[in-house]
């Protein structure tokens, strides 16, 4: 992965953390680990293993597969995929319907 791709991914993770925190999640950045989720998010006693995707093309099946593989036992998975050229994210959480979250402020 090139440095511009890593920078884009890092920007996406930072934006995702801000969005999660605006929705009362507590977040821990896990992106330094290769075989783990990008973010560990906690809310209401539930731990979420979050995969963040900041790509032009959203591939939900591929993203879900990676999220499931990286979620540790006892942790639910979540995928946050940035919708290109918007302030919105497609969010899919284990056991819930996909939805769109929009960044506030800016």
Predicted regions and their residues:
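Catalytic phosphate/metal-binding cores of nucleic-acid and nucleotide-processing enzymes, i.e., regions
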Residues: 1-106
């Amino acid at each position: 992965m090139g440095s511009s791709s890593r920078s884009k991914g890092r920007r996406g993770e930072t934006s995702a953390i801000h969005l999660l925190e605006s929705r009362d999640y507590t977040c821990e950045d896990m992106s330094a680990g290769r075989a783990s989720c990008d973010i560990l998010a906690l809310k209401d006693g539930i731990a979420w293993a979050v995969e963040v995707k900041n790509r032009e093309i959203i591939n939900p099946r591929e993203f879900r597969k990676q999220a499931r593989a990286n979620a540790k036992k006892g942790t639910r998975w979540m995928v946050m995929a940035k919708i290109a050229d918007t302030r919105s994210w497609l969010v899919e959480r284990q056991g819930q319907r996909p939805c769109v979250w929009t960044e506030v402020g800016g």
